[in-house]
Structure formats: C-alpha cells, structure tokens
Amino acid sequence: MPSAIGIDLGTTYSCVGVFQHGKVEIIANDQGNRTTPSYVAFSDTERLIGDAAKNQVAMNPTNTVFDAKRLIGRKFDDPKIQADMKHWPFTVVNDGGKPKIRVEFKGERKTFAPEEISSMVLTKMKETAEAYLGQSVKNAVITVPAYFNDSQRQATKDAGAIAGLNVMRIINEPTAAALAYGLDKNLKGERNVLIFDLGGGTFDVSILTIDEGSLFEVRSTAGDTHLGGEDFDNRMVGHFVEEFKRKHKKDLSKNARALRRLRTACERAKRTLSSSTEATIEIDALMDGIDYYTKISRARFEELCSDLFRSTLQPVEKALSDAKMDKSSIHDIVLVGGSTRIPKVQSLLQNFFAGKSLNLSINPDEAVAYGAAVQAAILSGDKDDKIQDVLLVDVAPLSLGIETAGGVMTKLIERNSRIPCKQTQIFSTYADNQPGVSIQVFEGERAMTKDNNLLGQFDLSGIPPAPRGVPQIEVTFDLDANGILNVAAKEKSTGKEKNITIKNDKGRLSQADIDRMVSEAEKFREEDEKQRERISARNQLEAYCFNLKQSLDGEGASKLSDADRKTVQDRCEETLRWIDGNTMADKEEFEHKMQELTKACSPIMTKLHQQAAGGPSPSSCAQQAGGFGGRTGPTVEEVD
C-alpha cells in the first residue's frame, strides 16, 4: 500500500516525514535540507519553490512570496494583515474582502490566493517525499496551529486538495509534537506534558496527559496565531532602519531590495545570538553605495523583543487554568519550534516553572512533521507494534452553543471539550402558544451571543399550542473528529425533528473575529487585574502614611526628637499630597513611593518602638513599619 505522509506546513519552513519499517524518516529535499523554506518566487522565466526561491529573494523581493500562512483563511481587513503588509515587499490586494497576492510572472501581472501559494509549498513537500519513496503519494496528514480557526483549517485543507493530496486529517501542531515526544521517549506511567510551540509565525501551548506512551489526551490548548520568529526579525529590522537613518540620513524602508538584504542579515544575527552574546552585521553597498557594518548584543535584542517574549507566558497560564492544573503538576515541558532556541524565551519559561528544567530532547524543527507522519500511518491502518495502540484525543478550541432569551449564549459544548463529542439539552418556549423556535448556533467565549460568531441557524415549527415553558425541545450538538458540527432539534411531544450540519464554511471566522472573541474577554480580565493591583498598591501606601501619623500621636512618641518627628510628619504629608494628585499612577510608582517612605521613616519608627520598651505596638503600625524595614516595599496585607 502506498505510504501516507505527514507534512508540517510552517509559516517560514516546512517539513515532511513518513513512517515505515517501524520508524519515522524525516525526508531531506533536493538540496539535502530536512526543512524547506515556505517561499515561492516568480520570475520572467520560471517559478521557484523552497530553497531556490529563498536564495534569490534579494534580487527579486517584490515577486517572492512568503508568510502565506499569515494570510490563509483570513479577511483582507484583518488588523493583523494590515500590520504585516508594512513588512512585506510583495503586494497584497483586496479581492472581495479576501487577501490575494499580486506578482509579475513571465511578464504578466497575476494574483494568487494564499491557498494557492501554500499549495505550491505542499506540492514541493509531496515531490520531496515521492523522490525518496520512489512512488507517487496521495494521502497526507497536514498540521495547523492548535489555535487556528475553522476558516484557516478549511483553507489549509483546500491548499492540500489544490496540491493533489487527499488530506486524511488536519491535526494540531502541538498534538503532533506530543505524539513525537511520547513515542520517541518510551514514556512510562501517566505524565502531564506541556508543549510550548513557538515557530516562525505562530505560537501554541497545549497540555496533554500521556499514559504509557500510547494514550494521548489533550487537556487544554491556548496560543496566538500571530506570534513568532518573523515578529522578532521585524523588531530587529526596525532597530537597524532607525540606526541607518541616524548615521547616514537615508531611509532604508523605501528600498525593497535593501530592506530584504537587511532582513536576511537580521535573521542570521538572531540565530547567532542564540549561541553568542553578540552578532555582527556586514552588508556591502546596502544603499547608495554605503557599506553598512554594525553590531547587536543579545541584551539589546532581548530588550527590542521583551514584550513579545513576555507575552508567551499568558497562554501558558491560560492553558494551565483551563486544564485545572497548577505548575507543579506538569512533569515535562517540551520545546518545539525554532524560536524556542532563544535563550531569553527558555529562561522566562523556566523561571515561570520555578526553575524546572526544560526538555530539549526532541528536534524542535522536525517534531511536528514526525507526529504528523505517525498519525498518517495510524489513519492508513498501519499495524506496526509501535503505533497500533496509540490513541489520540484532541479538543475543541472554542465553545459552541445556542442563543436563548435575552440574547444569552447558552453553551452546549465548552471550549477544550474532547472531540468527538455529543451534548444534549432540553429547552422550551418563551411565550404562550409559541408555534415555532429559531435555533441559532454560535461559537465563542463571551456571555452574550452578539459578541460571538454566528455559525448557522434553522427554524423548528409546528409546536402544538401550549403555555410558555411547557413544550420540550431537545437540542443536540454533535462535533466529530474533523471539527464538523451537526446540530439537531426535536420537539418531544410530536417527535418533529430538524437538523443542520455546520461544516467549516469558508466565511466562518476571520482572524479578527477569533482574536476579538478570545482576546477581548482576556483583555478585559487583564485590565481589571491591573486596576486591582494599582488600587491595592495605592491603599497600602495610604494606610502606611496614616499609620505613621497615628504613631506620632501614640504613647512613647514624646520620646522622639523634634527633628525625627518633623521628618516623619513632612514625609507623610508630602506622600499624601502626591497620592491625591496622582490617583491614576502605575502600581510601580506607588511601590516606589512606598520604598522611599519606608527608607526615610523605618529607622525612626524602629527607634520609637525600642523606646516603648518592647511593649505592645500601637495600632497595627509596628507590624507594618517594622515589617517593611530594609525590604523593597510591602509584602504583607494590612491587618485590622
């Protein structure tokens, strides 16, 4: 039987593997490389794919297309695409709300959909496998980021079909990587594994429980479909464009070829900085004959990307809380994706897990294709001992439900529910003698349906007249392994039934929608949390001031020198005035004021309490004042 292959279709690089003779082979391309750039170039004479396309990019920047994965399944007016367009040398145009790529090919102007560009990369991967296997290949498993929405998944599936592949299954990248890890390491017992997958353009975190290395159960997933190595490159490019402007008074950003040469040098420098603390950039005749020689330190690079690096921890926290686990219950932290080689990313993650060592034992560039190849073998019925017992249980990334009275979203399938799954709930009518109901199906995390995404709707009519709340309407949601939803509604007294299958419609969700749904709720939560922390810091500072002032009126205070008393009095008044004028200051500012005040008043308070001859401290101030002595700010809550 012809082999089925596994393809990791990446933002910047792609990789293909096949399972045969009891093991996975990652297949090298015609250049001898085990990963192939996801690049397609169009020239006056030919189309180039992979290494050949990337190698000529500086000569032909406007007709060399990359990052198709950042366009696929999205709408043209997606803010992420609008932001990316500033960095792309090729032209992206609006075609009926969808982004298309415009190039000059053989002297003609042509436009391609992102699916077509991706299909060209998939064709290259298919040919690479065929050359190795010596036979034609039809069946494939293709991976996508776990946080890809349905339109992105469907578009990826379409790209496979355009490439002449029968896409047996679309599977999630971190799940594929976990499969690679579990089979490669012969795990014993039950282990909770966190997959941290930071690639060229996307970021996923998944938590799985792996039992005896054969049952793989995804517990939760989180991520950002628009974060990766490309964004780190962009920051470095921006830094050098500014530097060039300062030094040479010329704007590189207007020159596509110069910008591309700079980007290639930045990408190389970024890789160097993973093993060295400094990288040198030397580009001859970068612009107007100017040779550009410069250096960048690892510390500067980390500072340029610090917010991006830190943002990788939010999905980790979200995945842990969704899986109802704490940090200590994770046995293995597995790094996948080339960007996890960045030392700062590793140290942030390690510190988050209180110094737990990270697992670097699988190849971060090849693990996803390895897992996809295993899944392809399982789906094509390979009976090899190593994989015949493997069972993979994945989850739905978003909640599914229907609209009930008042526009409320009533969830039937919660996000991170196992798929396939089936849920049934009984609903009733809202008005007396209501003859029918409209079932509207939504996807998303918000409480009201207007903030979520409508997937489809249908009407169930012919309900016998009855007072409100009497008819029983049974609604069933059935989500299959491919993420296709079937919704049925049945009126129990008459047995009348109606159903609808919601396939991954083309127009389901733009990235803007999915970002809005999951991020908005997150964003509001984060803003609330920030506000809470700020108020707490302000209250602690205020309470400390009042406690100090109280102490000056308490017993034993008469023993203080006038100078000391005046110091405390003045500092408190000054701080309280500052608080009144800066109620909206940041948490850090309040903490800084706290440190200053503590530093000034703590020694005086200590003197006061010693003079009180060890008697009970007045009010709660001694604990506060004494407790902060020599520290960097409050670490205890105020006690009544």
UniProtKB/Swiss-Prot annotation:
Gene: HSP70B2
Record key words, sorted: ATP-binding, Nucleotide-binding, Stress response
Protein family: Belongs to the heat shock protein 70 family.
Residue runs in coiled coils: none
Organism: Anopheles albimanus (New world malaria mosquito)
MF term (GO), any: ATP binding
Alphabetized NCBIfam families for the sequence: PRK00290.1
Protein origin, superkingdom: Eukaryota
Region (Disordered): 608-640
Designated name of the protein: Heat shock protein 70 B2
